[in-house]
């Protein structure tokens, strides 16, 4: 009799366990690329626009997406790193004043994201990327001028 009760209890536990929802998984989003306004015609103006506004959608404080060891504001960290390297390349196409404005813009917006959500890793990720790409002596993109603009924001 006790064996029958035991089997019924185990079967009930298994049936109850099967009915639970699985933890919801978040699918990484593509990087939110910017669209160049149609009024911008010259390549230089386009480079300046991209340099300054490249991160606008990514660092929008209203953007509420998961951030963890693999995701930054919903975007895969690897994808974000590639976009960061691309952005450094764009900075090389503009004058120093524009690059300073672009760097200031990025880090001010990342700081706003961090203040809005202390669990966010947006600011920390950009901090790591600045060290890796702008400051590291082994980086082919190393640029002390860019890093100084970034460090001045800290």
Predicted regions and their residues:
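Oxidative protein folding and maturation machinery
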Residues: 20-154
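C-terminal motif of bacterial Sec signal peptides marking the signal peptidase cleavage site
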Residues: 14-17
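Sec-dependent signal peptide recognition
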Residues: 2-9
């Amino acid at each position: 009799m006790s064996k029958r009760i035991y089997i019924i209890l185990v079967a009930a536990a298994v049936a109850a366990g099967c009915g639970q929802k699985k933890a919801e998984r978040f699918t990484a989003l593509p990087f939110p690329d910017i669209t160049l306004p149609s009024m911008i015609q010259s390549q230089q103006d386009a480079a300046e626009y991209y340099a300054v506004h490249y991160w606008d959608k990514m660092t929008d404080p209203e953007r509420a997406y998961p951030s963890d060891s693999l995701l930054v504001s919903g975007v895969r960290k690897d994808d974000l790193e590639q976009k960061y390297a691309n952005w450094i390349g764009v900075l090389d196409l503009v004058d120093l004043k524009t690059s300073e404005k672009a760097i200031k813009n990025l880090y001010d917006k990342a700081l706003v994201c961090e203040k809005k959500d202390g669990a966010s890793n947006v600011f920390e990720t950009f901090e790591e990327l600045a060290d890796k790409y702008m400051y590291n002596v082994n980086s082919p993109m190393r640029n002390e001028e860019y890093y100084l603009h970034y460090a001045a924001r800290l």
